[in-house]
Amino acid sequence: MAESKTFRAGVLSVVKHDYLPRAVAAHPRFELVVVADDADQPDWVHERNQLFAGEFGIPYVRDVTGVLAEHDLDLAVVSSEAERHCDLAIRAADAGLHVIADKPMSTRLSECDRLLEAVRRNNVKFLLWNRNFLPAVIQANEAIQSGAIGELHAIHVDFYFSKDAGPPKGTRQPGDPPIDWLERQLEAHADGSDGGLGVKPMGELQIEGIYPLGYIRMLTGVDVRRVFARTATHFHQANVDNHVDDLATVSLELDHGIVGSLCIGRIGGA
């Protein structure tokens, strides 16, 4: 029997959640060989990258371009702040590497289009982190495909996080400064509620929306034609101060007359 290939993976920043490179490292056919980031990133970025590289006994190099050219990689794992996802993924694709990236794909639609073009142009694969293969989702898909629940006409997903997001809405006293988004996210890293890590504030629809939207797309197998969404800030002072949502509802019209809806939010201890 031919020996299975081991794929060499480079981690392009690992400053947010590190579950993505850890998942890759846990697979027997993947090997993490290097962590890389751009030299002009702030100190906290380099510190987190170095800590992860040290844990896995691999080098941390402050030169993404050099690593892409010189380390004989098969794929890149992108786990930076959301606003840098597309830039790093495009650079990896242009270097001929397959890409596994953390969500969201980007905070801007134009950047998503650029990434899709780069993937197609270079004939590489792109995988965005998702939860489509959780047991409950698989069971739902089997029930739909088997006809056990009849013909699908409508689908709804509730997706809420109970992770905290700092002080509750309304707790900031007169004269207190607004909560700084990046500082709050850096503090939240310890308990895993830093999904919006980055300079640019992000609401929950941006941070977590891929999950329920991914479920709907997978379970229906059809495209969305019309969307109506509404966002609000009900729970967390950091979201109020930075003008981003912590609760959202979305209504969808899909092909074949199917309608979809989702509710999503980070409700903390509410």
Locate the predicted segments by residue.
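N-terminal Rossmann-like dinucleotide-binding module
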Residues: 1-55
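Predominantly a Rossmann-like dinucleotide-binding segment in NAD(P)-dependent oxidoreductases
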Residues: 15, 134-230, 234-240
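Short, Asp-centered acidic motifs that coordinate Mg2+ and/or phosphate
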Residues: 34, 74-75, 154
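Beta-loop-alpha module in the N-terminal Rossmann-like domain of NAD(P)-dependent dehydrogenases
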Residues: 56-118
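Hydrophobic residues in well-ordered beta-strands that form the structural core
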Residues: 62, 101, 126-128, 156, ...
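Rossmann-fold dehydrogenase core element
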Residues: 114-131, 151-155
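NAD(P)-dinucleotide binding in Rossmann-like oxidoreductases
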Residues: 231-234, 238-270
